[in-house]
């Protein structure tokens, strides 16, 4: 099976969990990293068996089958620690400039961006997003804080001013494996059973600790 693996912490957790379950089940998989535009083209051509995603982010999910959620993710507001802005929820973003990831969906923010109530800039990489916040190119950034902290640790990033994340996050979704053909439906129950066993094992905590 071919399945897309990204380079951020959240996808790393999902990818490692999937690989672990595949080993337990004797399934061979090939994981590939793809830019989002190329990913969509390969999906349309039927060249992928599965992707890591959230069903809330995919169009016409009735065409697919999917596993139980592997990990819960959300968007957090990030700002410089010395910022005087008081922002606790998405409504507080009106009139602000923010940076988001290119090609990502933000259900709570997209209407504000479309209406011009929020000025948005797009970053192609998580590090670029964090740097734009650090350098005051924008007021705020939007990123899952667990992913951000993993990127900072993995890349050894240093900032001229500390960054602060606002909790709780918003637009919570479950990352899962989305199978792009219904031929996989018979395997989903077995996958979910193996996933439940993994989450009750020491190995699951080891996977999480690698990224947090």
Question: Which ranges hold each PLM region?
Answer:
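Extracytoplasmic small-molecule ligand-binding "clamshell" domains
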Residues: 1-62, 122
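Short coil/turn segments
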Residues: 7-11, 55-57, 81-84, 96-106, ...
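Extended ligand-binding regions for polar small-molecule ligands
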Residues: 12-24, 84, 91-96, 103, ...
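Ligand-binding cleft/hinge of the Venus flytrap
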Residues: 16-27, 68-69, 90-94, 102-125, ...
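Hydrophobic residues within well-ordered alpha-helices
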Residues: 21, 43-44, 77, 93, ...
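A ligand-binding cleft/hinge motif common to bilobed small-molecule-binding domains
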Residues: 41, 53-63, 139-171
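Hydrophobic/proline-rich hinge and linker segments of small-molecule sensing/allosteric domains
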Residues: 67-88, 102, 179-181
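Periplasmic-binding protein-like
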Residues: 72-76, 157-192
């Amino acid at each position: 099976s071919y399945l897309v693996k990204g380079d951020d912490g959240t996808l790393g957790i999902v990818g490692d969990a999937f690989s672990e379950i595949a080993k337990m089940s004797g399934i061979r998989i090939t994981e590939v990293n793809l830019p989002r535009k190329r990913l969509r083209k390969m999906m349309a051509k039927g060249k992928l068996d599965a992707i890591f995603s959230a069903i809330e982010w995919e169009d016409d999910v009735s065409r697919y089958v999917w596993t139980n959620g592997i990990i819960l993710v959300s968007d957090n507001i990030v700002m410089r620690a010395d910022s005087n802005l008081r922002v606790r929820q998405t409504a507080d973003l009106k009139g602000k400039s923010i940076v988001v990831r290119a090609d990502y969906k933000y259900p709570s923010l997209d209407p504000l961006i479309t209406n011009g109530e929020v000025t948005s800039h797009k970053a192609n990489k998580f590090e670029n997003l964090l740097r734009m916040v650090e350098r005051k190119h924008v007021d705020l950034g939007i990123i899952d804080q667990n992913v951000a902290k993993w990127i900072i640790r993995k890349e050894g990033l240093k900032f001229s001013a500390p960054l602060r994340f606002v909790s709780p996050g918003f637009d919570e979704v479950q990352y899962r494996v989305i199978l792009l053909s219904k031929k996989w439906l018979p395997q989903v129950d077995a996958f979910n059973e193996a996933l439940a066993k993994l989450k009750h094992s020491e190995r699951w905590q080891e996977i999480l600790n690698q990224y947090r």
